[in-house]
């Protein structure tokens, strides 16, 4: 299976025999398991103070007063879960282990299957990405791409490759996040757009594009390739990066 290596003008520069990793069977179940585990392992432990609602000298009056046997302080119920200022019935525990494990072979299969999905136009299109009909996937560009330092230069390359519409889609579909997150520095939600995989340092010229991510071939994960457990992300590889991904 061959693919085209494009230069920065979008023209054909050479051809490349794709590594065997791009022929990995499609396994969305394994991909989902690996991505969910990665998300779970990033969670920060959280829990309630064990003594919350318990710092009170309240005691029950006992029988004979015609009132419930709940601990009271100045006539007001305390400590019990149904009382104002009482403890929580089953609060989250900070010591709870929220991590998830995935077998080594499963994790490797998930990564390889997610890589193979980036070469399937139907999977990429089903995920919502927009690109011209004559675009050949996977998209591979020459290593000169890693030397670009201006965002406008990257935009010009994407336009010549026929995939810039996906950046526009992500920018135009920006929405305000529901919930408290909007007041905590993450006001907007943007759809994921193009993933750039490079060989050396991540390209700073591409990282500011709407919805785009830039990672090295050594650090790319199944979650980068399948955000939200949905494989088939529109991906641009450099020539050196696609060879390094094959060795993962």
UniProtKB/Swiss-Prot annotation:
Pfam families: Ribosomal_L4 (PF00573). GO terms for cellular component: ribonucleoprotein complex; ribosome. It comes from the Archaea. The keyword Nucleotide-binding does not apply. GO terms for biological process: translation. GO terms for molecular function: rRNA binding; structural constituent of ribosome. Residues 45-105 are annotated as: Disordered. Residues 92-105 have a biased composition (Basic and acidic residues). Gene3D superfamilies: 3.40.1370.10. The keyword Ribosomal protein applies. Keywords: Ribonucleoprotein, Ribosomal protein, RNA-binding, rRNA-binding. Part of the 50S ribosomal subunit. NCBIfam families: rpl4p_arch. Belongs to the universal ribosomal protein uL4 family. One of the primary rRNA binding proteins, this protein initially binds near the 5'-end of the 23S rRNA. It is important during the early stages of 50S assembly. It makes multiple contacts with different domains of the 23S rRNA in the assembled 50S subunit and ribosome. Forms part of the polypeptide exit tunnel. This is Large ribosomal subunit protein uL4.
């Amino acid at each position: 299976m061959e693919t085209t290596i494009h230069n920065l003008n979008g023209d054909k520069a050479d051809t490349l025999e794709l590594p065997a990793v791009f022929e990995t069977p499609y396994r969305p179940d394994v991909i989902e398991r690996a991505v969910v585990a990665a998300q779970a392992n990033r969670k920060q432990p959280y829990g309630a103070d064990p003594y919350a609602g318990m710092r009170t000298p309240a005691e029950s009056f006992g029988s004979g007063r015609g009132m419930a046997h709940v601990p009271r302080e100045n006539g007001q119920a305390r400590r019990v879960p149904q009382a104002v200022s009482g403890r929580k019935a089953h609060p989250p525990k900070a010591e709870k282990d929220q991590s998830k494990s995935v077998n080594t072979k499963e994790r490797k299969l998930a990564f390889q299957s997610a890589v193979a999905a980036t070469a399937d136009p139907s999977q990429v299109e089903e995920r919502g990405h927009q690109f011209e009909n004559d675009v050949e996937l996977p998209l591979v560009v020459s290593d000169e791409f890693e030397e670009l330092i201006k965002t406008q230069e990257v935009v010009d390359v994407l336009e010549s490759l026929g995939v810039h519409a996906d950046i526009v889609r992500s920018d135009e579909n920006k929405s305000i996040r529901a919930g408290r997150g909007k007041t905590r520095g993450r006001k907007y939600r943007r759809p994921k757009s193009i993933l750039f995989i490079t060989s050396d340092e991540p390209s700073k010229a591409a990282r500011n594009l709407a919805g785009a991510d830039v990672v090295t071939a050594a650090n790319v994960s199944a979650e980068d390739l399948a955000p939200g457990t949905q494989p088939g992300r529109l991906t641009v590889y450099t020539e050196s990066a696609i060879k390094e991904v094959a060795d993962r």
